[in-house]
Amino acid sequence: MTKRVLISVSDKAGIVEFAQELKKLGWEIISTGGTKVALDNAGVDTIAIDDMTGFPEMMDGRVKTLHPNIHGGLLARRDLDSHLEAAKDNKIELIDLVVVNLYPFKETILKPDVTYADAVENIDIGGPSMLRSAAKNHASVTVVVDPADYAVVLDELSANGETTYETRQRLAAKVFRHTAAYDALIAEYFTAQVGESKPEKLTLTYDLKQAMRYGENPQQDADFYQKALPTDYSIASAKQLNGKELSFNNIRDADAAIRIIRDFKDRPTVVALKHMNPCGIGQADNIETAWDYAYESDPVSIFGGIVVLNREVDAATAEKMHGVFLEIIIAPSYTDEALAILINKKKNLRILALPFNAQEASEVEAEYTGVVGGLLVQNQDVVKESPADWQVVTKRQPTETEATALEFAWKAIKYVKSNGIIVTNDHMTLGVGPGQTNRVASVRLAIDQAKDRLNGAVLASDAFFPFADNVEEIAKAGIKAIIQPGGSVRDQESIEAADKYGLTMVFTGVRHFRH
C-alpha cells in the first residue's frame, strides 16, 4: 500500500531534503501553495492539494485543506473496518504522515509596524486543524510540527518502514502543546486589543529557555522559561558575555536587581544584591564613585552577590569590581578594556548586558505568583510618586539634605523584603533590616548594621509604624529624619514621639510591602 505524506510548511528549513528522502523511500507527497512550489522547483514530484479534494484553493488560500478528503484521510482509524469502508466508499485516500508548521503569527505581531489586519491574516486555521486531526489519530498517523524532528522520523522510516508508537505519541503531545500555545498567543493578542484586563480564562505562553541543573536547592528540579513574546529588559533576554550558565537563584536575584535599579534613572547608580534584598546602593556623578558607595554600604554582604550598574562600565570601575568575588555583573554596556579586565582570570564570572532604554516597557507587565492550586496576578509596584505629594506630619521640616536623603531612601526601601527598614544618607545605603516578623526588630537590625555611620542618616519604612516604639528606637540611635507611608490608627502617637525628640517625619501615603 502506498504511503502518503501531506506537507504544508511556512518554515521551509530542511523540507526539501526531508521530502527527497521520503521519495527515495517510496512515499507519495501531497502539498499546498508555496510548499509545493518549493518542492517542485527542487525536482520533488508532488500532488496538489486540490487534486485530492477536487476543490480549488480559494479566498487567498484561506480555504484549501478544510475538506473531508483531507481530514477523513487523517482521522480514519486503521483498526476499524467501518472507518476503512467509509473511506473507500467516499474515495478518501489515507494519509500516514503530516508535516505542518503554522503561519508566523508570533513573528507578525512582533513587527513594530504590524497592523491589526496583518495579525488577523496570519492566524492559521487549516494548519492547526490538520495537526490536531493527525495528533488525535496518532495510533496510525505520524505528525511533525518541528523541523528538529525530521531526522528521527526518517531514521525510523528507513529502519522499520514506519515510526514507533512511542514516537508518534511523543510527537502528538508536542503538537497539542504547539497548537495550544499558538491559540493562547492569539487569545493574548486579542485580549490586549479589546482592553480586557481581567479575563475569565488565563493562558500563558512560555518557551523553554534553559534546562537547569536544579532549582532553589539541589533536591528541586527546575527549568527556565521565557515569554513567547519576549521582554527586552529582562534576564531572559539578557546577552551573556561571559561565565557559566545562570542558576535558578542567580536568575531570581538578578531579576530583583534589575527591578531595583529602574527607580534610579536620574544619576549613575550601582545596586548590590544578595538573596533578593539590596545590600548596597550607591549613587554619584560617575559610575566609579557610585560603585565605591555601593561597596562601602556593606563590604561583607556584597561577597558572592549580584551587581547591576545603570551606566557603561569603564576600566576604572571594572578594576575595582575585579577585586571582589561577585556572581553576576549587569550593565547596559562595557568598554572593551573593562570587559577584558573583568574576564581576566574570572572565567566563571557571569557578565550580562541589558538594554536599559527598554526599562519602561518592562514595567507594564503583570506579575505572577504561584500558590498551591492557583496563581496570583497583579500589576508591578511601579506607581509614580512625587515628593510634592508627600506630607510632613511633624513640627520640624526636613532640611534640604534630609529631603534628598529621604527621597533616596524611599526609592531604596521599595525592594527590601517586608517588614522592611533601610537607613541611608543622600547617596548610599547604610543599613538594611529585611524580612523580620515585627517592625521594631527590622528597625534595630538596620540601625545595628549602620552603627557608627548614623550622623546625618535617615530611615525609611516600607509600611506604617503600628506603635510609637519604632520612633523611640530611631530617636535613641540619633537618626533625625523618617519617611514612611502612614496609615496606622496610632499614627498620632508616632507623630507625637517624633515631635518629642525633634525628628522630622514624612508620610508618602503609599505602602511598599514586598513578600
From Swiss-Prot:
Keyword hit for Secreted: no
Enzyme Commission code: 2.1.2.3, 3.5.4.10
Keyword RNA-binding belongs to the record: no
InterPro entries the record matches: AICAR_Tfase_dup_dom_sf, Cytidine_deaminase-like, MGS-like_dom, MGS-like_dom_sf, PurH-like
Listed Pfam families: AICARFT_IMPCHas, MGS
GO cellular component: cytosol
SUPFAM superfamilies registered for this protein in UniProt: Cytidine deaminase-like (SSF53927), Methylglyoxal synthase-like (SSF52335)
Superkingdom: Bacteria
Annotated pathway: Purine metabolism; IMP biosynthesis via de novo pathway; 5-formamido-1-(5-phospho-D-ribosyl)imidazole-4-carboxamide from 5-amino-1-(5-phospho-D-ribosyl)imidazole-4-carboxamide (10-formyl THF route): step 1/1; Purine metabolism; IMP biosynthesis via de novo pathway; IMP from 5-formamido-1-(5-phospho-D-ribosyl)imidazole-4-carboxamide: step 1/1
GO biological process: 'de novo' IMP biosynthetic process
Domain annotation MGS-like: ranges: 1-145
Catalytic activity of the protein: (6R)-10-formyltetrahydrofolate + 5-amino-1-(5-phospho-beta-D-ribosyl)imidazole-4-carboxamide = 5-formamido-1-(5-phospho-D-ribosyl)imidazole-4-carboxamide + (6S)-5,6,7,8-tetrahydrofolate; IMP + H2O = 5-formamido-1-(5-phospho-D-ribosyl)imidazole-4-carboxamide
Keywords for this protein: Hydrolase, Multifunctional enzyme, Purine biosynthesis, Transferase
Domain statement: The IMP cyclohydrolase activity resides in the N-terminal region.
NCBIfam families on file: PRK00881.1, purH
Family designation: Belongs to the PurH family.
Record-given protein name: Bifunctional purine biosynthesis protein PurH
